[in-house]
């Protein structure tokens, strides 16, 4: 994989010289090999090592090169046709029954996204570079953006959106860690991290500029929901006191033992 990384990094430095007609065969093959590695889960855009999330920038480079060097073409989806550069993950794929993934009609998964066994997709959308781990449910009309990382046993409720992050290359993707619940119509975007075991209420919107207020500590932070947080939508007064600014409010933090005994509705109501 080291050789592949070197080829992609060098190609990216000269990306402006490539078109669909002029990309050298060696680079073309390296791009497609990288997309295949992402597609089957052997490579991830980001991975947690020693408690820290690290981004594989070269894998993001490969996706951007893929967009640049692939021609537009027609894809037969059985019930209709699509015209795009990136094929669907399961187009003409006889391995789908062996993948252990349940895909309900009208769910869309792009090539280069990985779905672990025992995941369920209701009619939803999963973009290239995304990683969805085992036991996760992507509910109706939920979206998982490019390169987003979704952990084990996560529930993305109806209409929830997990934002994609391809550029800048060094930016972390949006990350939802294991055992999280993301409420209906909530949006977690711009590389925000929701740590293990957190519960996000319906209609919570969190980007990098969204104040995250911890009711217990009275701290305001940005870009990260700590592990075990129970979060609801709210607002904080502006510095001049003339208006309120939308905020995400951490009403409490709970451990795994507490969460296993208490329903999600009870956790949210107690706030």
Swiss-Prot record:
Gene3D superfamilies in UniProt: Hexapeptide repeat proteins, Tetrahydrodipicolinate-N-succinyltransferase, N-terminal domain
Catalyzed chemical reaction(s): (S)-2,3,4,5-tetrahydrodipicolinate + succinyl-CoA + H2O = (S)-2-succinylamino-6-oxoheptanedioate + CoA
Pfam families according to UniProt: Hexapep_2, THDPS_N_2
Catalytic activity, EC: 2.3.1.117
Molecular-function GO terms, alphabetical: 2,3,4,5-tetrahydropyridine-2,6-dicarboxylate N-succinyltransferase activity
Keywords: Acyltransferase, Amino-acid biosynthesis, Cytoplasm, Diaminopimelate biosynthesis, Lysine biosynthesis, Repeat, Transferase
InterPro entries attached to this UniProt entry: DapD_Trfase_Hexpep_rpt_fam, Hexapep, THP_succinylTrfase_dom1, THP_succinylTrfase_N_sf, Trans_hexapeptide_repeat, Trimer_LpxA-like_sf
GO terms of biological process kind: diaminopimelate biosynthetic process; lysine biosynthetic process via diaminopimelate
Major localisation: cytoplasm
Pathway: Amino-acid biosynthesis; L-lysine biosynthesis via DAP pathway; LL-2,6-diaminopimelate from (S)-tetrahydrodipicolinate (succinylase route): step 1/3
Intracellular or extracellular location(s): Cytoplasm
Kinase listed as a keyword: no
Principal EC category: transferase
Superkingdom to which the source organism belongs: Bacteria
Keyword match Transferase: yes
GO cellular component: cytoplasm
PANTHER family linked to this entry: 2,3,4,5-TETRAHYDROPYRIDINE-2,6-DICARBOXYLATE N-ACETYLTRANSFERASE, ACETYLTRANSFERASE
Family named by the database record: Belongs to the transferase hexapeptide repeat family.
The protein's name in its UniProt record: 2,3,4,5-tetrahydropyridine-2,6-dicarboxylate N-succinyltransferase
Species of origin: Coxiella burnetii (strain CbuK_Q154) (Coxiella burnetii (strain Q154))
């Amino acid at each position: 994989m080291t050789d592949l990384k070197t080829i992609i990094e060098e190609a990216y430095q000269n990306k402006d010289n490539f078109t669909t007609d002029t990309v050298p065969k060696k680079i073309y093959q390296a791009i497609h090999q990288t997309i295949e590695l992402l597609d089957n889960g052997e490579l991830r855009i980001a991975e947690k090592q020693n408690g820290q999330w690290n981004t594989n920038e070269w894998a993001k480079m490969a996706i951007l090169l893929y967009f640049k060097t692939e021609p537009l073409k027609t894809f037969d989806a059985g019930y209709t046709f699509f015209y795009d550069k990136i094929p669907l993950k399961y187009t003409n794929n006889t391995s789908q029954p062996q993948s252990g993934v349940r895909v309900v009609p009208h769910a869309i998964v792009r090539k280069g996204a990985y779905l672990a066994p025992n995941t369920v997709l209701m009619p939803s959308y999963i973009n290239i570079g995304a990683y969805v781990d085992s036991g996760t449910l992507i509910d109706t009309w939920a979206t998982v953006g490019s390169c987003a990382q979704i952990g084990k046993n996560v529930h993305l409720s109806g209409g929830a959106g997990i934002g994609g992050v391809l550029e800048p290359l060094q930016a972390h993707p949006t990350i939802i860690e294991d055992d999280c619940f993301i409420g209906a119509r909530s949006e977690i975007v711009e590389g925000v991290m929701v740590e293990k075991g957190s519960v996000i209420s319906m209609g919570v919107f969190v980007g990098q500029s969204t104040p995250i207020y911890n009711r217990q500590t009275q701290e305001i932070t940005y870009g990260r929901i700590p592990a075990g947080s129970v979060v609801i939508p709210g607002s904080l007064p502006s510095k001049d006191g003339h208006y309120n600014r939308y905020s995400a409010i951490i009403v409490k933090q709970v451990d795994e033992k507490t969460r296993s005994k208490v329903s999600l509705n009870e956790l949210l109501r107690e706030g």
